């Protein structure tokens, strides 16, 4: 920023490009002369009545002998580093075509990044977060340079951020090398073309934006809490004349769009000299609108060269730049900047004091916090009710036990009314998975009975204390109004209902009972399903609940004689009805919130469950967000009597062969968790016997390996969450049969290096025969290095490929052609990644290394077709895997999970749809999942 006049103004610098070889060959004369570091003079003879001056004054003028480092230090450094102080800044490169704008901007960007990282290293007291984005405007179409596609992005108006680009990728910078890689990607993605004036002319406007957020590691009142600002490096395309560039077709169209956008930009600059304006006739002005606002600073770097033909262009742009230097609207700029920095700390305090709000789109993310808040509010309300309860007893003269018990009966009746549904609805409710857990998450309602007090949690909102008092009084009035006959009839009805509930609970206990420690209170959990809310009693407290119910039923009979003689008032009936309506309204609110939360969970990808009918499948499921092991209610009697069914039994899905023309239709072949093979009879009608035998052998082999792999775990667990202890017969069945399959002392399979190399070579040959995708080969080759634990995975891959080869050989040519086409498309995609990942000099060495002529066509595609071709040369295989890994950006092999190749014997919690064994897709996911 340069100070002058009434305040700070936009810094404008001019750099003169030296003559190139063509200009020297033509003996061109320099028409511009740098008098000093602020003035430039035109040496060309001007007409007497010329409207243009011969001398121009700018903030900085750099001659043709000035290096880019000096241009940055004197003209752009202060503006670029404003972003570290929380001030938005922008650096433009503006000039005619072939004037060296891109060359200058690349150097300025590099030096600015160096200074920013140096500043970050020195100021260790603050935590910095850097985000980088890059966009390109080509023919008035906005494109994201980091996305890798040519899709056009829309411009959206945000009330807080201004004009934003739709789905713009913002990369979080990890280090200096990461930023250099992103700059290289932007350089390769930008549109360039050849014209008569420039061989590598930029045909688009490029905007590189670096956003820096800094936060103090230790809070102090003297420093602001958080600073956030952005610096934009803008390389505008050069203006050009069609008569000089001799362009036509696409180049002419590009030049028209470039000139139109630059003309609009000049108009905006001239109008900004007097008043702010809302002119946005092109995409450039839309995106750069924030650079002309108050909270920003800007530096305009003009590039020019000494040519007589371009004097008019430079003079026209000089007028625009002179307009930029006027400080008429810039005075408010710095004042607002400093005001913004001073008020940032106060704004942070205001934001911290605000109560967290919950909206519908993030309801299931903050569910636990919402439940905790509502629990606290409800607990406070219950305490107030308990404090007021003795006063109400004294005023009415009625025992508290009778009152609390009657309210308990009413609430139970309300809950039973909520459970009543049609038979069809009950079937839907029964399809839900019930969870009975002492330490369950607060996704369920809990009715806790302790010392004859009733607590309901969590609810939508806590009822106020006055409403609670009204409930108690209305309950008492209703009790007074009831006649002895009515009381006796109600008690008989309650006894019948209690007897039915005891009988039902006894039946449920036979199914769901589990040993658990004695507890001092009984808990009833209600888990809401997508269709209805159902009340389920805790299996660990069945006996206590039954005895408590019987005692309270007897207590009703004794207390009825005490309560029947109490008089009633005329308005008791109305009061009771009003209370009942309030209770119903509260229940509706609770039901609405829980149903809304359930619906949000169903829409989210983290809420996927298998719905099985309780008689066959009655176990606990767990969502991805829940990391606790939930107790299941599966009785040994039910487990022993489990019958394998095609529709209801939990089975291990191994694979599914997709039907193709000329190929028999086959559905999934599965074996259950007990390792007993079960094959769908419907799929065996048209099944090939030879293919079926091989398939059975493959499944049997995997089944045997699954047993062995399951036996090496120290404490294996079934999917039910119950520790598994193999019987004597099972231990005999899983005993190793060969030295290769023996279990070492550390609990892993032992495998010699010769056996590993033999299996590896055989797998590589089968990969080539089956046309397995190169991505899968690379992952597998880099991940499994011969560790003892790799034996199972190598054996599974070998069996899978052997079965696949036999299947393809028995099948028609359709499947083989499909795999060949898929592999060809993959190689074409890999060839497109070579220019993006490697610069030109590295690609030359790569072509020579793989035996591709440098002057030939489609060199990258030739390299892609040479990958993984020589299956006998291990050096060739290693080089192929290394190249594919670099192109695809694979992580380190030590960080890649081996379970990604499908030998995850523990069942997955979500309902994963079987994608089938498609020959046109990757063969990297054969999972033993349920």
UniProtKB/Swiss-Prot annotation:
<dbReference type="InterPro" id="IPR027417">
    <property type="entry name" value="P-loop_NTPase"/>
</dbReference>
<feature type="binding site">
    <location>
        <begin position="95"/>
        <end position="102"/>
    </location>
    <ligand>
        <name>ATP</name>
    </ligand>
</feature>
<keyword id="KW-0505">Motor protein</keyword>
<feature type="compositionally biased region" description="Basic and acidic residues">
    <location>
        <begin position="533"/>
        <end position="558"/>
    </location>
</feature>
<feature type="compositionally biased region" description="Low complexity">
    <location>
        <begin position="666"/>
        <end position="681"/>
    </location>
</feature>
<dbReference type="GO" id="GO:0008017">
    <property type="term" value="F:microtubule binding"/>
</dbReference>
<dbReference type="GO" id="GO:0005874">
    <property type="term" value="C:microtubule"/>
</dbReference>
<feature type="domain" description="Kinesin motor">
    <location>
        <begin position="9"/>
        <end position="273"/>
    </location>
</feature>
<dbReference type="InterPro" id="IPR036961">
    <property type="entry name" value="Kinesin_motor_dom_sf"/>
</dbReference>
<keyword id="KW-0067">ATP-binding</keyword>
<keyword id="KW-1017">Isopeptide bond</keyword>
<dbReference type="InterPro" id="IPR019821">
    <property type="entry name" value="Kinesin_motor_CS"/>
</dbReference>
<dbReference type="GO" id="GO:0003777">
    <property type="term" value="F:microtubule motor activity"/>
</dbReference>
<dbReference type="GO" id="GO:0007018">
    <property type="term" value="P:microtubule-based movement"/>
</dbReference>
<dbReference type="InterPro" id="IPR027640">
    <property type="entry name" value="Kinesin-like_fam"/>
</dbReference>
<dbReference type="InterPro" id="IPR021881">
    <property type="entry name" value="NACK_C"/>
</dbReference>
<dbReference type="Pfam" id="PF00225">
    <property type="entry name" value="Kinesin"/>
</dbReference>
<feature type="region of interest" description="Disordered">
    <location>
        <begin position="655"/>
        <end position="686"/>
    </location>
</feature>
<dbReference type="GO" id="GO:0005524">
    <property type="term" value="F:ATP binding"/>
</dbReference>
<keyword id="KW-0547">Nucleotide-binding</keyword>
<dbReference type="InterPro" id="IPR001752">
    <property type="entry name" value="Kinesin_motor_dom"/>
</dbReference>
<keyword id="KW-0493">Microtubule</keyword>
<feature type="compositionally biased region" description="Basic and acidic residues">
    <location>
        <begin position="473"/>
        <end position="482"/>
    </location>
</feature>
<dbReference type="Pfam" id="PF11995">
    <property type="entry name" value="DUF3490"/>
</dbReference>
<feature type="compositionally biased region" description="Low complexity">
    <location>
        <begin position="459"/>
        <end position="468"/>
    </location>
</feature>
<feature type="cross-link" description="Glycyl lysine isopeptide (Lys-Gly) (interchain with G-Cter in ubiquitin)">
    <location>
        <position position="805"/>
    </location>
</feature>
<keyword id="KW-0832">Ubl conjugation</keyword>
<feature type="region of interest" description="Disordered">
    <location>
        <begin position="449"/>
        <end position="569"/>
    </location>
</feature>
<comment type="similarity">
    <text>Belongs to the TRAFAC class myosin-kinesin ATPase superfamily. Kinesin family. KIN-7 subfamily.</text>
</comment>
<protein>
    <recommendedName>
        <fullName>Kinesin-like protein KIN-7J</fullName>
    </recommendedName>
</protein>
């Amino acid at each position: 920023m340069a100070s002058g006049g009434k305040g700070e103004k936009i810094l404008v610098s001019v750099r003169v490009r030296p003559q190139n070889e063509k200009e020297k060959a033509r003996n061109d004369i320099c028409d511009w002369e740098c008098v000093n570091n602020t003035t430039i003079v035109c040496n060309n003879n001007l007409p007497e009545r010329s409207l243009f001056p011969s001398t121009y004054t700018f903030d900085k003028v750099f001659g043709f002998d000035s290096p880019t480092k000096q241009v940055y230090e004197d003209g752009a450094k202060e503006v670029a580093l404003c972003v570290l102080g929380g001030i938005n800044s922008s650096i433009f490169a503006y000039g005619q075509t072939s004037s060296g704008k891109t060359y200058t901007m690349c150097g300025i960007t590099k030096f600015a990044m160096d200074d920013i990282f140096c500043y970050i290293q020195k100021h260790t007291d603050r935590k910095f977060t850097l985000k980088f984005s890059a966009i390109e405007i080509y023919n008035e179409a906005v494109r994201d340079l980091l996305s890798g596609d040519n899709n056009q992005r829309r411009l959206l108006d945000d009330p807080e951020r201004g004009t934003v680009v739709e789905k713009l990728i913002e990369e979080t910078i990890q280090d200096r090398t990461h930023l250099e890689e992103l700059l290289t990607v932007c350089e390769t993605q930008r549109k360039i073309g050849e014209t008569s004036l420039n061989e590598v002319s930029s045909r688009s406007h490029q905007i590189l934006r670096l956003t820096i957020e800094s936060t103090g590691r230790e809070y102090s009142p003297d420093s602001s809490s958080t600073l956030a600002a952005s610096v934009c490096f803008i390389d505008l395309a050069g203006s050009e004349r069609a008569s000089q560039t001799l362009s036509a077709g696409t180049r002419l169209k590009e030049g028209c769009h470039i000139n139109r956008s630059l003309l609009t930009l000049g108009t905006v600059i001239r109008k900004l000299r007097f008043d702010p304006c809302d002119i946005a006739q092109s995409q450039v002005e839309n995106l750069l609108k924030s650079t002309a606002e108050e909270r920003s600073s800007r530096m305009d770097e003009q590039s020019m060269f000494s040519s007589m033909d371009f004097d008019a262009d430079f003079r026209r742009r000089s007028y625009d730049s002179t307009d930029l230097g006027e400080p008429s609207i810039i005075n408010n700029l710095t004042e607002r900047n400093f005001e913004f920095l001073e008020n940032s700390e106060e704004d942070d305090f205001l934001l911290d004091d605000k109560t967290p709000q919950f909206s519908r789109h993030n309801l299931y993310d903050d569910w636990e916090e919402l439940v905790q808040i509502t629990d606290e509010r409800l607990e406070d309300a219950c305490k107030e009710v308990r404090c007021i309860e003795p006063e109400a007893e004294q005023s009415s003269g009625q025992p508290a036990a009778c009152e609390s018990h009657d309210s308990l009966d009413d609430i139970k009746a309300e809950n039973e009314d909520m459970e009543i549904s049609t038979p069809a609805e009950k079937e839907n409710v029964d399809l839900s998975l019930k969870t009975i857990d002492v330490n369950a998450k607060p996704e369920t309602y809990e009715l806790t009975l302790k010392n004859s007090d009733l607590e309901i949690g969590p609810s939508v909102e806590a009822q106020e204390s006055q409403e609670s008092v009204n409930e108690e009084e209305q309950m008492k009035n209703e009790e007074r109004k009831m006649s002895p006959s009515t009381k006796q009839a109600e008690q008989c009805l309650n006894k019948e209902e209690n007897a039915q509930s005891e009988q039902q609970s006894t039946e449920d206990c036979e199914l769901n009972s589990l040993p658990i420690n004695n507890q001092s209170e009984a808990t009833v959990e209600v888990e809401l399903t997508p269709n209805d809310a159902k009340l389920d009693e805790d299996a660990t407290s069945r006996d206590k609940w039954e005895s408590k119910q019987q005692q309270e039923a007897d207590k009703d009979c004794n207390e009825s004689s005490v309560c029947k003689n109490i008089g009633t008032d005329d308005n008791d009936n109305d009061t009771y009805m009003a209370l009942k309506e309030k209770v119903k309204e509260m229940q509706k609110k609770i039901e609405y919130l829980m149903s809304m939360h359930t619906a949000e969970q169903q829409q989210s990808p983290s809420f996927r469950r298998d719905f099985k009918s309780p008689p066959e499948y009655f176990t606990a499921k767990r969502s991805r967000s829940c990391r606790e092991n939930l107790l299941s209610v599966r009785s040994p009697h039910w487990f022993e009597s489990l019958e394998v069914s095609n529709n209801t039994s939990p089975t291990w899905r191994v694979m599914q062969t997709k039907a193709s023309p000329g190929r028999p239709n086959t559905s999934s072949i599965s074996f259950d968790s007990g390792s007993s093979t079960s094959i769908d009879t419907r799929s065996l009608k048209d099944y090939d016997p030879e293919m079926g035998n091989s398939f059975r052998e493959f499944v049997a082999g995997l089944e045997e390996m699954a047993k062995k792999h399951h036996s090496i775990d120290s404490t294996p667990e079934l999917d039910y969450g119950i520790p598994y202890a193999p019987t004597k017969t099972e231990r005999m069945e899983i005993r190793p049969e060969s030295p290769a399959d023996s279990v070492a002392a550390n609990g892993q399979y032992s495998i010699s290096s010769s056996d590993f190399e033999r299996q590896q070579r055989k797998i590589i040959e089968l990969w080539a025969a089956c046309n397995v995708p190169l991505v899968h080969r690379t992952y597998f080759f880099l991940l499994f290095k011969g560790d003892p634990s790799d034996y199972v995975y190598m054996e599974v891959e070998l069996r899978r490929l052997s079965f696949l080869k036999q299947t393809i050989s028995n099948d028609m040519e359709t499947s083989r052609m499909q795999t060949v086409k898929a592999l060809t498309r993959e190689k074409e995609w890999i060839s497109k990644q070579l220019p993006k990942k490697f610069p030109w000099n590295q690609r030359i060495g790569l072509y020579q290394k793989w035996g591709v002529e440098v002057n030939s066509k489609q060199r990258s595609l030739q390299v892609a077709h040479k990958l993984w071709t020589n299956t006998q040369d291990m050096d060739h295989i290693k080089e192929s895997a290394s190249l594919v890994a670099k192109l695809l950006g694979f992580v380190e092999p030590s960080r890649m999970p081996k379970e990604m190749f499908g030998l995850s014997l523990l069942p997955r919690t979500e309902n994963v749809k079987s994608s089938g064994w498609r020959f046109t897709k990757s063969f990297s996911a054969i999972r033993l999942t349920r």
